[in-house]
């Protein structure tokens, strides 16, 4: 082990010099959670969902999105991964024809921003 110590020390030093990493939702998705919050508020998502931080009338047709960033699944059965969430937000019925969630007409950028915002809900 002693002869590997300089190598390990060098690798640890390089890792420390890399600097802070952006949050995972920004690294993976390149979405902006601030814009996503604005899109959520403007798109009427609270008509069906309770969304912490959005002060509008809250519906109960869809699930609460509190803690969404910690969930393992989207819509109860799809893996909660950034690409899947973005695809879901773009056109839920294309992924699950039986879903009650309609397509909201979001652009790809808006969907990434909304996904980034949803991942901040922990």
Please name every model-derived segment.
Residues 1-7:
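Bacterial N-terminal signal peptides that target proteins for export
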Residues 9-11:
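Low-complexity proline/serine/threonine-rich segments in eukaryotic and viral proteins
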Residues 13-16:
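C-terminal motif of bacterial Sec signal peptides marking the signal peptidase cleavage site
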Residues 18-41:
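Electrostatic cytochrome c docking/interface patches
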Residues 20, 51-52:
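Cys/His-rich metal-chelating microdomains
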Residues 23, 54-55:
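Short, non-ligating residues that shape and space the ligands of small metal-coordination modules
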Residues 38, 56-122:
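Extracytoplasmic electron-transfer domains, predominantly the class I c-type cytochrome c fold
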Residues 45-48:
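Short cysteine clusters
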């Amino acid at each position: 082990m002693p002869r590997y110590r300089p190598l390990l020390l060098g690798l640890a030093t390089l890792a420390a010099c890399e600097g802070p990493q952006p949050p995972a939702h920004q690294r993976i998705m390149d979405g902006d959670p601030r814009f996503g919050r604005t899109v959520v508020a403007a798109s009427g998502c609270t008509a069906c969902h309770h969304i912490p931080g959005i002060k509008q009338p809250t519906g109960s047709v869809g699930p609460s999105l509190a803690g969404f960033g910690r969930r393992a699944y989207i819509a109860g059965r799809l893996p909660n991964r950034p690409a899947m969430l973005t695809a879901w937000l773009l056109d839920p019925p294309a992924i699950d024809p039986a879903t009650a969630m309609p397509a909201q007409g979001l652009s790809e950028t808006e969907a990434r921003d909304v996904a980034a915002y949803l991942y901040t809900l922990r």
